[in-house]
Structures are given as C-alpha cells and as structure tokens.
Amino acid sequence: MKMRRWMVWLLTGLLPLMNGCAGFWDAESSSSSSLTTTTLSSGYFFVLNIETNQIISYYVASGTLTKVASYTTPTTPITLAVAPNNSFLYLGTVGGIYVYSISSGKLTIANSGGVISSDEAYTMQVTPNNAWLIEAVSGTANVMAIPLSTSTGLPTGSEQSPSSGLPSSAIQQLAVSPNGDYVFVAMGSGGTAYIPFTSGNSNPFGSVTTISTYSTSGAALSVAVDPDERLLYIGETAATSSSNSGGLRVFKFSSFSELSGSPYATGGLAPYSILPEAGGSYVYVANRQTASSTTGLIEGYTITSSSSTYALSSMASNFTAGIHTVALAEDSSDQFVFAVNIGGSYDLNAYVFDSTNAGYLDKVIQSSTGSDPVEAGAIAAIH
C-alpha cells in the first residue's frame, strides 16, 4: 500500500486539525531579531524533504548552518534513520528501503542502488548493536526486524515479526530502548505496543502487550525512551481537558506503571515528536500545532527523582518552532536541538541550551531546506 504522510494523517483523522485561516498555513515572521547568537558547532545531521525527494546533509559551523550536500532520493521518501555506529543511513520510501554509507556527512548509496526490503517503512530505527533494522508500515498491523551486517549495513537473512502481529494498523512511530531489550510502537487510536526484543534470537520478538490510550477518543502519535531506561514516554492527543489537549504520558520503565501526575499537558494539540535529552535531565515534546495557531510549539520538562520515584515539571516557558513541527533531534555534541517543519518557509529550526535557565532552548537558526514547499518531514543526526 503506497501511503504518503498526508494520506496517513487523513486516515487517522488528524488532517482536519491542519486547516489555517489564511492560505492554509499561518504566516511566519521574517524577522531574525528573536534569534540568539552562538559560536557553537554541531555534528552532522540529515533532513528529509519529502515533497522534493531530497536528503540534505548539514552541520553547524561556529553558529552558521552549513550544507554538506543534497541527494535526490530514488523515489518518494517517507522516513530515515541513522545507525548507532554512524556508518549507515536507512531511507524508507514508497518503493522500499534503501541504505547509504556515511562518510564525513556525505552519503553514498549502497547495495548497487537497490532496495534491501520492499516494505514502505513509515517509521524505523536501528538497534543499539547495529544488528537489526526495526521498521513498520502504516496500514499494516505488524512490525518487522531485518537482520543486518554491522560491517556492510546490508541484510544477512529474512525479516522477522512478532508471531501475533500488532493489534492495530494505524502505525505512527516506533522506538527501540537504549539497551535494545524492548521495541515500542505508537499505533494511533490502537494505543502503544511494547514487545520484548532479544537480539541474539533468530526471531528476536517476544509477545506483544498494549498500553491503551488515556482517552477513548485519543491517539498515540509518538513514543520514546529515557536514555538510562528509567522512563517510557508516549505522546497522545485528547489526553488533557484543556483546549490544547495533547498530553505526554510517562511510565516507569521497569514496571510500565504510569507516573502520578501523568499525562502532562504539552501545550498543543498533536505531540508528534518526543526528545529525551541525552544527559537524562530533560525531555522535550514537539506539538505540531496549538488550538489557536499552526505554528509548532516545543514544551520542555525537567525530570526529578528520589529513591526511584520520578516526576516531571514543565518549564516556565515553551519554545516556538515553525509551521507544523513534526520531528526533533539532538546532535552528537549534545549542544543543539533541531526541529523540522512540514509547512511555511522555515523548514528547519536549531536551538542551543540556555546558559542561565537550565534546560531552556534558545533559537539560533531558522532556515529553509530547499525551494518551498519542500515538506521537511523527518530528521536524523549522527549519534
């Protein structure tokens, strides 16, 4: 089933949220007066322009966004992922999954330019040991694992899946735990599946368990795991009682029991991306829009713990992004947070951590990633 992101939003009932009052997208300010100056530099990262069939490779050099190269994808792209060893980039398209080798931010297509799987992966991630590519196709009630060679990035055998499949085909996003022992799949109104994963087994998947949505009218859009495997995060719609009803649900990883105080308000309608900060002190949620604006909003939370009891507190300020923000990434230096936006003229925003207010994000870059509309729909960074 060939399915673009717009089609998935239609099927999950999310596209009606995207209407704007003026020309579909709200207007963006062209002023850069709100930008903070920085001299910091980042690692390499890759932005996927879905509408223009491009992967753009970037890094930040002393505060300046620097383009490495632009690559035309073999067919209409959907998503991408970088392997933890930073040697390979995997590209999901309507024609299947391709693999590229990475060298100093430059890409070279591998496997003689052919696909390594015919699956139209909507979401994917490589396991921490680089041995499996986990991927799922929206519209198919399953999640797949492709065994990989850690030296070539190519498949070494047939793909595997849970014996029972998944209880829902409304696939939104997947995540692999940092230790590689669980796979999580956000399945829209079908809730979130968690599956034990044993890399050394011929079929690494265990039995599927489902966490239902907080509200019967809600949908699980995003999922992520704390870098130290303390907490599991799920972003859902219709999870709070405010007009901006998006919620961040938080579970203790060891028991998958929900924290007191969860769900936490995200300040927007559709929590499309969750970014646990690499140091483990903060977590950020990108809302694609709010009840009053198509401008994306990033909500930040501070994580506290006492005797293995965890709590989150919202930062006093939130952080604006671009039009319909859909994905976040942290760079390999742990100094930058990047956001991509599918609408408007600023396809990419970059932030650094504020030097005074712990965890706050200061916007330092706002830029197009091509001749708009490009639909910058995914981002992946070198680890």
What are these regions (language model features)?
Residues 11-44:
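Bacterial Sec-dependent N-terminal signal peptides
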Residues 39-41, 82-86, 126-129, 176-180, ...:
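Residue-level detector of Asp-centered blade-edge/turn motifs that repeat once per structural unit
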Residues 51-53, 96-97, 139-142, 189-191, ...:
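Short glycine/acidic-enriched loop and turn motifs that connect beta-strands
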Residues 57-64, 100-107, 145-154, 194-205, ...:
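Short loop/turn segments immediately following beta-strands, especially the blade-tip
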Residues 64-72, 108-116, 157-165, 206-215, ...:
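A short beta-strand motif characteristic of beta-propeller blades
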Residues 76-81, 119-126, 168-175, 218-224, ...:
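Repeated scaffold domains used in trafficking and secretory/extracellular systems
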Residues 342-352, 358-383:
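Blade-level signature of beta-propeller repeat domains, shared across WD40, Kelch, NHL, RCC1
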